Design a protein with these regions (language model features):
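N-terminal beta-strand motif that seeds the catalytic metal site of vicinal oxygen chelate
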Residues: 1-24, 74-76, 126-128
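Vicinal oxygen chelate
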Residues: 2-9, 50, 87, 91-128
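Core segments of cupin and vicinal oxygen chelate
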Residues: 17-58
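Exposed loop/turn and edge beta-strand positions of beta-sandwich/beta-sheet ligand-binding modules
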Residues: 45, 72, 106
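Short glycine/serine/proline-enriched coil/turn segments at secondary-structure junctions
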Residues: 67-70
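Mid-chain, well-packed structural core segment of small domains
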Residues: 75-84
């Protein structure tokens, strides 16, 4: 038996938060294009909009007047149900893929930008 180091065992990602300038425009992108559902907020902050995927994973959109400058490697990653279909949809509606490729485990990925310039990764299922 392998001895576990002192650590907190995590099960899954609960939510990620993205800072946006226009929550309505961002909801069109995340709900309309990526399939999130708008759900009731569980906090008393009118500047945070809660979205959820069928898996239960959540995205919180925090609306501010000025979204902070972020390094290019900071992003949220979402697994596509069908990677090829997702790529075709993005091509069809004119959303450009900034970078794409295949990782060592065979997982394919592509990066796009949301309406506020936040980097978003769309990926296939992990190969591990």
């Amino acid at each position: 038996m392998v001895d576990k180091p002192n650590r907190v065992d995590l099960k899954t990602i609960n939510h990620v938060l993205t800072v946006v300038k226009d929550v309505k425009k961002s909801m069109e992108f995340y709900c309309g294009l990526l399939g999130f559902k708008h759900i009731q907020s569980m906090v008393d902050n009118p500047d945070i909009t809660w979205l959820q995927l069928p898996s239960g994973a959540m995205l919180h959109l925090h609306e501010t007047d000025t979204a902070p400058v972020k390094p290019d490697n900071v992003h949220n990653a979402f697994e596509a149900a069908d990677f090829d279909s997702a790529k075709q949809t993005l091509d069809k509606i004119g959303i450009s893929v900034e970078r794409s490729g295949t990782r060592n485990d065979g997982q394919r990925f592509m990066f796009i930008r949301d309406p506020d310039g936040n980097l978003v990764e769309i990926c296939a299922a992990s190969g591990f």
